[in-house]
């Protein structure tokens, strides 16, 4: 299914019929230019479970300011340039359309904001998700430093919620003599 969210934040509940979060879904956290393998593995598990798939992108350039009692989430940008998050979501949608076109699974996209682990956790609670799928981080010194300061999304999800998590390797396994900090 093509994007039923029309760019709307899946956390918002302003219009419960058009923005309802699919129940018992498989959730996959996706970033732009991520290998297609993460999406195809998530689709495979959604098909096995007979569950819908939510392709979630977290805009880390925005943060949650507050949530209305009705569930509508208000956000504010960290940077005044909003176009970065919108462009990333468009790239995620294009990748999802290409990867999931013939997958035989109902899917939708969700734009989340803030900390990736907390945003995915919140969405998983709303959907009563069966599984959360994420990819490993990219190799390279820059990604190692980023992970040192922000932590692994997969590890943080494993410690902060109780749903099963599938971590999909992005690259071929490293050999024993490979440099883990080398850019790929």
Predicted regions and their residues:
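Short, well-ordered secondary-structure micro-motifs
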Residues: 38-39, 65-68, 121-122, 144-145, ...
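A short acidic, glycine-rich active-site loop
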Residues: 74-91, 142
């Amino acid at each position: 299914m093509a994007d039923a969210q029309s760019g709307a934040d899946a956390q918002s509940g302003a219009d419960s019929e058009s923005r309802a979060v699919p129940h018992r879904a498989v959730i996959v956290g996706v970033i732009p230019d991520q290998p297609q393998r993460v999406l195809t593995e998530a689709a495979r598990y959604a098909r096995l479970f007979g569950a819908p798939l939510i392709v979630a992108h977290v805009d880390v350039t925005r943060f949650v300011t507050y949530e209305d009692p009705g569930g509508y989430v208000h956000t504010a940008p960290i940077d005044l340039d909003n176009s970065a998050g919108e462009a990333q979501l468009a790239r995620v949608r294009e990748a999802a359309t290409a990867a999931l076109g013939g997958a035989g699974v109902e899917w939708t996209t969700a734009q989340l904001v803030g900390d990736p682990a907390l945003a995915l956790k919140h969405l998983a609670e709303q959907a009563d998700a069966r599984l959360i799928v994420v990819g490993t981080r990219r190799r390279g010194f820059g990604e190692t430093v980023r992970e040192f300061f922000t932590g692994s999304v997969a590890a943080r999800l494993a410690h902060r919620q109780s749903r099963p998590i599938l971590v999909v390797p992005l690259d071929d396994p490293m050999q024993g003599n490979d440099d883990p900090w080398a850019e790929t």
